[in-house]
């Protein structure tokens, strides 16, 4: 619908600027108010839960408004590359993500004779993962800083673009969530080198691997982290963890792709961010 398309032009940018100017005094007043209040102990956790409940409510309302979700332009190809044998499965998009998308959408058709039901469950799951990551981020901010930053972070997560992305059939949503968790866990490790116990090591390993599985250029992130860790002479445990994930991803994108008949050749283009 052309009438529903937002035109990104000078007027739109100017409108956004005026909107930010109007919101800014409200944010400043709120920051000054909470700076004057000393909040400790159980009240911190209560305010954290209240902030998350606000985000949860807003996101559920957005989910209902956008129900069953937002179909991206590539979604039809993802569906048909698993449905039809004459269309090869491409590594340009994550085969795992596309396969899960197909599984949910096709299940909606098989069990309810409705594609939208399957897609609604898919977007709900994707949104739940994003909310889980948001909870972890808010908890970290609440534990390490103060309530003011929790409030500001809550306002940030209430921006419409975040929930819209989480309800869109785009691998960027899960990639962003996994990337954020990797960064968060690495920050935890930098603050406390004893953080990487068995449980947290497995958690970091899985989030790193998921980040690379969802988007091919996730390997670039790990390569940069590995290089930085080597220069900073990080502990061997972290170096081995990063190396093992990169090796596993190489096996996944090599022999596993070949075994499953995934067509390669476009992944490098995506990793280099070249136009299609």
Regions found by a protein language model. Give the residues of each.
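Transmembrane signal-anchor helices characteristic of membrane glycosylation enzymes that use polyprenol
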Residues: 1, 15-25, 44-71, 246-258
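Membrane-interface alpha helices of multi-pass inner-membrane proteins
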Residues: 200-215, 226-230, 245-252
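Transmembrane-helix motifs of polytopic, lipid-linked glycan transferases
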Residues: 25, 121-144, 181
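Specific aromatic-rich, kink-prone transmembrane helix
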Residues: 83, 174-192, 203-204, 208, ...
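Aromatic- and kink-enriched transmembrane "portal" helix at the membrane-lumen/periplasm boundary
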Residues: 3-9, 64, 95, 115-123, ...
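Extracytoplasmic catalytic/substrate-binding loops of multi-pass membrane glycan-assembly enzymes
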Residues: 66-80, 87-104, 108, 112-117
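Juxtamembrane membrane-water interface segments immediately following transmembrane helices
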Residues: 72-73, 78, 239-276
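Loop-to-helix entry region of an early transmembrane alpha helix in multi-pass inner-membrane enzymes
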Residues: 12-17, 95, 99, 109-132
């Amino acid at each position: 619908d052309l009438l529903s398309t937002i035109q990104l032009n000078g007027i739109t940018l100017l409108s956004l600027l005026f909107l930010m100017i109007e919101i800014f005094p409200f944010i400043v007043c709120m920051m000054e108010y909470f700076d004057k209040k000393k909040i400790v102990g159980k009240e911190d956790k209560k305010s954290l839960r209240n902030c998350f409940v606000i985000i949860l409510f807003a996101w559920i309302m957005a989910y209902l408004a956008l129900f069953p979700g937002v179909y991206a332009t590539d979604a039809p190809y993802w569906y048909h590359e698993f449905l039809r044998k004459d269309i090869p499965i491409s590594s340009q998009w994550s085969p795992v993500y596309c396969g899960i998308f197909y599984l949910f959408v096709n299940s909606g058709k098989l069990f309810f004779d409705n594609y939208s039901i399957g897609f609604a469950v898919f977007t709900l799951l994707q949104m739940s993962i994003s909310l889980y990551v948001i909870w972890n981020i808010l908890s970290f901010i609440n534990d390490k800083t103060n309530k003011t930053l929790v409030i500001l972070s809550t306002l940030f997560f209430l921006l419409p673009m975040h929930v819209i992305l989480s309800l869109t059939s785009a691998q960027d949503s899960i990639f962003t969530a996994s990337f954020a968790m990797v960064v968060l866990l690495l920050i935890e490790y930098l603050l406390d080198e004893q953080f990487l116990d068995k449980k947290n090591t497995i958690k970091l390993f899985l989030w790193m691997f998921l980040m690379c599985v969802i988007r091919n250029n996730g390997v670039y992130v790990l390569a940069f982290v590995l290089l930085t860790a080597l220069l900073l002479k990080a502990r061997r445990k972290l170096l081995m963890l990063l190396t093992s994930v990169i090796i596993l991803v190489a096996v996944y994108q090599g022999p596993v792709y070949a075994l499953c008949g995934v067509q390669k050749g476009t992944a490098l283009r995506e990793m280099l961010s070249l136009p299609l």
